[in-house]
Amino acid sequence: MSIQVHDTLTAQKRELVPLEPGKLRLYVCGPTVYDYSHLGHARCYVVWDVVVRHLRARGLEVRFVRNFTDVDDKIIQRANERGEDPIALASRFADAFHEDMDALGNLRPDVEPRVSGHIPEIVALIARLVERGFAYAPGNGDVYYAVRKFPEYGRLSKRNLDDLIAGARVEPGEAKRDPLDFALWKAAKPGEPAWESPWGKGRPGWHIECSAMTQKHLGAPIDLHAGGKDLVFPHHTNEIAQSVAATSDGLHAEDFARYWMHNGFVQIDDEKMSKSLGNFFTIRDVLARFDGEALRFFLLGTHYRRDFNFSDQVLAEAERRLSALYETVEKAERLGAGAAPAAEPAFVERARAALDDDFNTPQVLGIVAEAFTEANALADRKGKKSPEEKARLAAFARGARAVGAVLGILDRPPAQALSAIRDRAAARRGIDGGEVERSIAERAAARAAKDFARSDAIRDALLARGVVLMDGPQGTTWKVE
């Protein structure tokens, strides 16, 4: 087994070799919790959830840490607007984030540190940087990182200092020695949360927070650091500078994290989703209209490093495909019940190999679709199933569930999943499920009375509204086209 990942630091695909055999330490930058999470968060955290699931399925003992940033300028601004305590506001939105992640089927991290609970570690790390000459306190209560002291600054983002200096500036009131320097500690201001430090009361800067929490919960160096590609600069670039300067004499980026992975953006009409452009969707906005597993399935249809466009139409198509998969699983499990054990289908190992190759989820979904087409044809074949055919269907169902477990899909009873997906689709179309059920009952009565003209009229009227009836051994079910 060889797992290949695209490493942002080297801009190459590399074999993922943990520092300690059999174990892997992963840090993912979590959300700044000042509002409800958006589709970009959904994409990001579904990606890293699949990474964790696959690494564990491949036998690695993964320690997964993802933080909450609950001390930040945006949180303070939002809390002041609402007259609310910043930490309380952040805690409320952290709870909402958990609800959203649960709805998407994401596993919880092993550790979820919060900045507000790690102030002593942050202060100690800043003091270490000052002591080693990589940071300075100009005397106004702030502490800054001296960027030019770190020789590999910008290596991750492929930017040199000359390029960076053109866009750098010093804000009024700042006491930077160099426009490139960035804040590690910010002096207290009225109405802001503040903690004691050797430089006076204040609060940490954004970048130092993740460095401190990574070191506390994973040590240094770690195997893998991940997040959205918007974090490459400045956040991850600054994390490297801080963490390496505090812990290593070699001053190489690998002394903090051996591998770096980044996911692409969610776009609306080829533009990055943002509030300023008015094309912003929260996870809750979408889950009010679509099933959470359908959204997850949709997100996995694009390679994690690529940007992709979101639209209701494309998501609805993903929802339809997921329903079709569940329908096939239902048939395979029902028809293969009680069959003798059979060998694992070849598509399962092909799916594993695709995930080994930089977590190629769209390729996995393509492999699964091929296998489902074959299973569907076998299940729909007329006549009694032979013991061999039953065994093949049962093996397919087990394989589908195994691949689904790594992707975080196909984990519900088919009837439950199909009903949930159908009900969301019906609500979007303004279809009353209760009314449909009453029509089905009326049609059943007409058929019992051999009034087939009435029965057909009811079926056709429902079909005209996008409702498809399916007659089976257990009665009539329905779905929305």
Swiss-Prot record:
Task: Spell out the reaction equation it catalyses.
Answer: tRNA(Cys) + L-cysteine + ATP = L-cysteinyl-tRNA(Cys) + AMP + diphosphate
Q: What is this protein called?
A: Cysteine--tRNA ligase
Q: How is the cofactor bound?
A: Binds 1 zinc ion per subunit.
**What is its EC class?**
ligase
Which intervals of this chain are the motif 'HIGH' region?
31-41
Q: Where is this motif: 'KMSKS' region?
A: 272-276
User: What does the sequence similarity comment in the record state about its family?
Assistant: Belongs to the class-I aminoacyl-tRNA synthetase family.
Respond yes or no to whether keyword Ion transport is given for this record.
Answer: no
Q: Name one GO molecular function term.
A: cysteine-tRNA ligase activity
Q: How does it assemble?
A: Monomer.
Pfam families hit by this protein: CysS_C, DALR_2, tRNA-synt_1e
Name a single GO cellular component. Answer: cytosol
What EC number(s) does its UniProt record assign?
A: 6.1.1.16
Cite the entry's keywords alphabetically.
Aminoacyl-tRNA synthetase, ATP-binding, Cytoplasm, Ligase, Metal-binding, Nucleotide-binding, Protein biosynthesis, Zinc
Tell me which residues bind ATP: 275
The alphabetized list of GO BP terms reads: cysteinyl-tRNA aminoacylation
Q: Where in the cell is it found?
A: Cytoplasm
